[in-house]
Amino acid sequence: MLQRTLAKSISVTGVGLHSGERVALTLHPAPENSGISFRRTDLDGEMGEQIKLTPYLINDTRLSSTIVTDKGVRVGTIEHIMSALSAYGIDNALIELNAPEIPIMDGSSLPFIYLLQDAGVVDQKAQKRFLKILKPVEIKEAGKWVRFTPYDGFKVTLTIEFDHPVFNRSSPTFEIDFAGKSYIDEIARARTFGFMHEVEMMRAHNLGLGGNLNNAIVIDDTDVLNPEGLRYPDEFVRHKILDAIGDLYIVGHPIVGAFEGYKSGHAINNALLRAVLADETAYDRVEFADSDDLPDAFHELNIRTCG
């Protein structure tokens, strides 16, 4: 299977969920083997240089996955766009933005899916590389845990736990095996969510300044405040899977393995990536030149190109 990038550049505008700032974002094609990079067009000189994404640049995980470079350049809330890039198997892209945060759009990854559909996807000449999990790797922190296990495909299983009546109406656990299920149908529409009682605390820390009922599910003491209700009965846990897929794609390759989590979040997801990369016996970087060898979970990627 070959690496892929966008067929053309494409732009969108929106608002940062936490910064509240208006953002203009452009996705560009990028050369093979260049990976996913970001560039702040509102910054000059070294501060405005391209940032090649790696798990080691995720240095702020308060409510999102945020790049913080050693020069202090920030690119916040990257998990939703990374989740969409993962769904389309985009290996190489440059993402330019003129503010410190990716726009939240409607709180899901679906607007970014539409953006990628409009741009189109093309194969490149180099072979796509996958990160294959070779042995179990687990992180446990304060009653939470995440783990990778070997698996011939890509499967995600997550369980959430919130002491609130709205979460008792659906299963706290969701599992999706991408060999038989579609990311776009099952995951992409799930929106981020938050609680009314947390708004004052968040805004005191300059977080959630752009949040509203158009880009998040808002929950009061008893119910969902959004008049349209939920997009899935179990939208909350599905959104956590959307986040996890984006967090995991920060490693730069599709993952051949199973990911499981209990009360997972951005910090522990990133810690798991770092733990895997720190143990050379835990993973291998593999290629599938023959499509017959490609795990079924990735076959759908073969139909999402326009060249």
Swiss-Prot record:
Keywords: Hydrolase, Lipid A biosynthesis, Lipid biosynthesis, Lipid metabolism, Metal-binding, Zinc. GO terms for cellular component: membrane. Its EC number is 3.5.1.108. It catalyses: a UDP-3-O-[(3R)-3-hydroxyacyl]-N-acetyl-alpha-D-glucosamine + H2O = a UDP-3-O-[(3R)-3-hydroxyacyl]-alpha-D-glucosamine + acetate. GO terms for biological process: lipid A biosynthetic process. Zn(2+) binds at H80, H239, D243. Pathway: Glycolipid biosynthesis; lipid IV(A) biosynthesis; lipid IV(A) from (3R)-3-hydroxytetradecanoyl-[acyl-carrier-protein] and UDP-N-acetyl-alpha-D-glucosamine: step 2/6. Disulfide bonds: none annotated. Gene3D superfamilies: lpxc deacetylase, domain 1, lpxc deacetylase, domain 2. It is an enzyme of class 3 (hydrolase). It holds the Pfam family LpxC. Its cofactor is Zn(2+). The keyword Transport does not apply. GO terms for molecular function: metal ion binding; UDP-3-O-acyl-N-acetylglucosamine deacetylase activity. The active site is at H266. NCBIfam families: lpxC. Belongs to the LpxC family. Catalyzes the hydrolysis of UDP-3-O-myristoyl-N-acetylglucosamine to form UDP-3-O-myristoylglucosamine and acetate, the committed step in lipid A biosynthesis. This is UDP-3-O-acyl-N-acetylglucosamine deacetylase. It comes from Neisseria meningitidis serogroup B (strain ATCC BAA-335 / MC58).
